[in-house]
Amino acid sequence: MDQEHLNPEALNFPFPAIIGVDEAKKALLAALVSDDIRTVLIQGGTGSAKTTLIRSLTGISEREVLNLPLGTNDDQVFGIIDLEETLLTGERRMMPGILQKSDLNILHADDVNLMDHSLLDQLLESVNRQKALVEREGLSYEYRCRTTFIGTMN
């Protein structure tokens, strides 16, 4: 059976069945239930079930897990103001980035230590403020981002 026909739920290992990562599990559970915990960093060696653990969160939470690929740029993360539509309609229109799409969900970045540091700083600031600001061509757009950011690294 090829990948496109696999049930995405079948790819997720059950959260309770993952063993040997108790501290990481406690941190993730705390982040799921607390509005005050907005970021979690999990460090572990290759093959230590970091990504499996993050994916398993969909089985114990209503929240989706969105992945932030390494090499993603500012516009892909924060979104862009659709200047053409804004000029045509007179209303600011936003083309959302992954941060806006992750509102009320979980945003996961693997190898977070390899991310562009400036982008990571802006991302963490937005997550902690629960608001993101996009400024382009003299226009600005602010949106809520009540996301939980989880970074993993070796």
Please name every model-derived segment.
Residues 9-43:
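Pre-Walker A (pre-P-loop) alpha-helix and adjacent loop at the N terminus of AAA/AAA+ ATPase modules
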Residues 29-32, 86-107:
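Conserved alpha-helical scaffold flanking the Walker A/P-loop in AAA+ ATPase domains
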Residues 30-34, 122-130:
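P-loop NTPase nucleotide-binding module
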Residues 32-70:
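Walker A/P-loop
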Residues 37, 43-45, 87-98, 112, ...:
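Conserved Walker
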Residues 44, 53, 73-74, 100-127:
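Conserved AAA+/SF3 P-loop NTPase catalytic/coupling segment centered on the Walker-B
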Residues 60-86:
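AAA+/P-loop NTPase substrate/partner-engagement loops
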Residues 108-109, 134-135, 147-154:
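Structural recognition of the conserved hydrophobic beta-strand(s) that form the central parallel beta-sheet
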